[in-house]
Curated annotation (Swiss-Prot):
With S4 and S5 plays an important role in translational accuracy. Located at the interface of the 30S and 50S subunits. GO terms for biological process: response to antibiotic; translation. This is Small ribosomal subunit protein uS12c. The keyword tRNA processing does not apply. Belongs to the universal ribosomal protein uS12 family. It is found in: Plastid, Chloroplast. It comes from the Eukaryota. It comes from Solanum nigrum.
Amino acid sequence: TITPKKPNSALRKVARVRLTSGFEITAYIPGIGHNSQEHSVVLVRGGRVKDLPGVRYHIVRGTLDAVGVKDRQQGRSKYGVKKPK
């Protein structure tokens, strides 16, 4: 977790990711709660987080080892959640 620039205040969830190309990047984990651990394999997309300096990537939820957000009802496709029955 890292803290955002002024005037915002929070503990934003981020992960250090080693890409297959050998680069080591910092990626943001969107949504509430996550299951990512030290050796999780994740898919990364571009897109910076404006109030987190140096964070230029997002982790894609709902693919590989990153599960979707639990109990999400709206805006589900961005968080890897199937339609509830």
